[in-house]
Amino acid sequence: MTIGIMSVANMAPLYLGIEHGFFEDEGLDVELVVAQGGAAIVPSVISGDFAFGYGNVVSLMQARDRDLDVQIVAGSTQSAQDEASIANGLLVAPDSEITDLEDIAGHSVAVTTLNNAGELTTRATLEAAGVDVSTVEFLEMGFPEMNEAVLAGHVDVAWQAEPFVTMGESEGMVNIADPYLGTLPRLDAAVYFSSEAFVDSDPDTVAAFQRALGTSIDYALEHEDESRAIVLTFTEIPESVANEMVLAQYSPVVNMASIELQADLALEYGMIENPVDVDALLADGSRAEGE
């Protein structure tokens, strides 16, 4: 069974689960294939090359809007519950005139992909602060390039995630706000998904994957030191940063309020053309019982 993933720290529960045999215990022989990004994973899942993939919620809504029948099968990475555990941020230079969300009006913000999760969460957070988002310019840029671009004055704000938040703060950059938390506590940032064809044809494997992932996430949350250590085996994050960065929040099931809000915002912001059928987007077992 092949899973398409990205080389990011949030893969820690998956790697820990494989290392400790949680997937093998469910009868699953897992092969991980690292892709350049979520955009490359979706077509491989649809074609059947990957049984499962890892990607952000907005991208999956956009895929369904293009009649690609992806389905969320499990949760994964969620935003912080409160200010004490933020792992994302809007970073500015140490000497920036921007000191709060209101100051971002009339400035530029770097996001990894236009019309996607970065822009959606930043817009929602700024609007909640009363900012006229039409005055904000969004620029597309990779996470590794953002901090230096801000420090060099090429862009005013970086929509960042760990470990780049910790790396930026070590250079004196200031985190104005966590746009995920500003949109909604426990916002589902990334999930595991499959194709409807695979979900319908092999529900036993889907259920086994959900159980193994749930066990893996529980283990990761209970063993922070192991989570930090295993990140060093599949990323190029320096050990000093891995030891300091804020670890993501994880959940094997999605937060329904989060999925519904992102669907509404994606439609409002023109990121999709049609309303999302949330029930069709979510496979059995991907949400908490009763939701």
Q: Model regions: which residues?
A:
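Short, solvent-exposed loop/beta-turn-alpha elements that line the ligand-binding surface or hinge
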Residues: 25, 79-84, 181-184, 250-258, ...
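Ligand-binding "clamshell"
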Residues: 63-76, 126, 133-134, 167-180
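A local structural motif
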Residues: 1, 24-35, 49-51, 127-142, ...
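Conserved C-terminal helix/tail region of periplasmic/extracytoplasmic solute-binding proteins
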Residues: 267-291
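Pocket-lining segment of extracytoplasmic ligand-binding domains
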Residues: 58, 138-139, 144-230
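Extracytoplasmic/secreted envelope proteins and their assembly/folding machinery
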Residues: 11, 15, 42, 57-60, ...
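Short, glycine-/small- and polar/acidic-enriched structural segments
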Residues: 1-128, 156, 186
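Secondary-structure end/capping motifs
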Residues: 200-271
